[in-house]
Amino acid sequence: MSWYMNKSMGRIAGACGLALALSGCAHDANRSPKELLSLSVSGLSGVDRYAFSGDTAIGAASGTASRPAAFRGTVQHHDQVSVQTEGGADEMPAGVHPLRLLNDVERMAARAEVVPEASNGQRTVLRITADPAKAAKVWSNRLRSEFALLENKVPANSPAASARDDGTRSQAKPSAFREAWDRELDRSRKEFEAMLSTMSVRSTSTLAIDRKKLLPLSLEERTEFRYEANGKPARESRTTRIAFKRP
């Protein structure tokens, strides 16, 4: 009888252990992929301090790709972002802000699905497909922000920049340069807006989520742009990868 009881208790204990081991799976098995996406975004917004690193690469229609711009940074007090880019650049690449990027991914999402072959007991991996119209709107805003940064820049070796550094120099040349610079900016702005008006966007993201904490582990966003430039069809791509780390 005692042998039977011990054997039965062993089976019960084993079953309980298995249930506990699978509890993490059951925890997110009851939630849809879109719910998991939403929970990971809201979860990150509630984290007071974390670190991140990654890179952004831009590809042309010819198949050539720019050297990825690497970055790393920290977030404190939920939304105070500090970023360092490779080479000591002081500009944060557009879209790098981790929480804003995740919010955009959620906002654009038309479909989210679990990727079984990439998921395991520790993480759930989602593939998120963006709605083309929403993606075009989000990316138009991102690209306009990038263009606005360019508008505020003056080449370092220009007469205007030299005069800014040396108050004794004549202002005539800087004034002429500034006029030419503004004309070029105006022309570029019109071309840029014409490009945006024809732009279509396809974007997919891969998000790895900690199954226990429901926090993002990594994100990869792949986006393809098709548009017209000077009346000719053009295509570009952009890939941004971010890994999250709690200190």
What role is predicted for each listed range?
Residues S82-G87, P155-D165, S237-T240:
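Short C-terminal domain-edge/linker segments immediately following a structured domain
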Residues R189-P247:
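Acidic, serine/threonine-rich low-complexity disordered tracts
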Residues S42-Y50, S119-G121, T198, R211-L217:
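Edge/loop elements at the starts and ends of beta-strands within beta-rich repeat scaffolds
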Residues G54-S140:
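An acidic-aromatic
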Residues S2-G59:
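N-terminal leader/targeting segments and the immediate start of mature chains
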Residues T129-M199:
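Mixed-charge, low-complexity intrinsically disordered segments
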Residues R11, A29-N30, A94, S170, ...:
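Intrinsic-disorder-associated interaction segments
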Residues F52-G54, T124-I128, L215-T223:
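A short hydrophobic beta-strand element
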